[in-house]
């Protein structure tokens, strides 16, 4: 047997008196193994503390007490607060978390999810800006339960926890319309359902309710990055807009500083409402008025929902919508 600290599949196979292929089949849950052989291999895995022993115990109980969490950007303040809510409830119910970042890349997102499935997680919480058809296909093929947190599902297929982003957009427009008739929508990528379908619809409806026309020239698309907001500032000014509803806090912070650089005073010359009320809204000067979301609760409630599904408990609601509001600060009058 190895004399170093690393126990290998070879060590397990030799100790159990079986082939390495048999050990692999046991660890991966292959049913083509005799029951007495399976038990013997699992016993050796436990005794030698072979690295997949947690998985092996999970195969015996059909649970690994591990939950995969897919996050699009681990550095994003909004998603990091969501993840904190998930982790706290997971700890309360004695689940371990495997946090996996997709880096806002669709292909990596698919790979990340398949990796979590391969780890035999008991469930997945998905956070993302949109659900691609590839992701939907992966979720529909798998037996592993999935809950969406802060993610829009227009097809209403998956359990989810969210706020009403359309109504939130309407509320933002209503506040800005008190002093302005040219209100820009500074959006993240419009391919994301939360922007192109939900927030945009709310923005249009908000304008309609205030008797204001919708103009495509007042809709600006950008990535969720500070620099993109900063660079957009002059275009927003040139559009004639004197106020903006912004889809993301980092983007809004960039726009705010870009307006200052262009000689505009906020809120005297230009008003801004952002969307997430993350800590970024408090780091700017002035602090940003924002749609207030119970971000931590979005994660915590999603994790509690997942524990119910994993324990075969009945869900009272498949889609939970939490309350939102507007927290007025220094970027509005």
From Swiss-Prot:
Under PANTHER family, the record lists: ARABINOSE METABOLISM TRANSCRIPTIONAL REPRESSOR, LACI-RELATED TRANSCRIPTIONAL REPRESSOR
Q: Which organism is it from?
A: Streptococcus mutans serotype c (strain ATCC 700610 / UA159)
Q: Do you know which InterPro entries this protein is assigned to?
A: CcpA, HTH_LacI, LacI/GalR-like_sensor, Lambda_DNA-bd_dom_sf, Peripla_BP_I
What one GO molecular function would you report for this record?
A: transcription cis-regulatory region binding
Instruction: Note the Gene3D superfamilies from the entry.
Output: 3.40.50.2300, lambda repressor-like DNA-binding domains
Pfam families assigned:
LacI, Peripla_BP_3
* Protein name as annotated: Catabolite control protein A
Q: Which ranges of the sequence are annotated as binding DNA?
A: 9-28
CDD domains (UniProt xref): HTH_LacI, PBP1_CcpA
Swiss-Prot/TrEMBL keywords: Activator, DNA-binding, Repressor, Transcription, Transcription regulation
- Keyword tRNA processing in record: no
Q: Which residues form the HTH lacI-type domain?
A: 7-61
The record's function comment reads: Global transcriptional regulator of carbon catabolite repression (CCR) and carbon catabolite activation (CCA), which ensures optimal energy usage under diverse conditions.
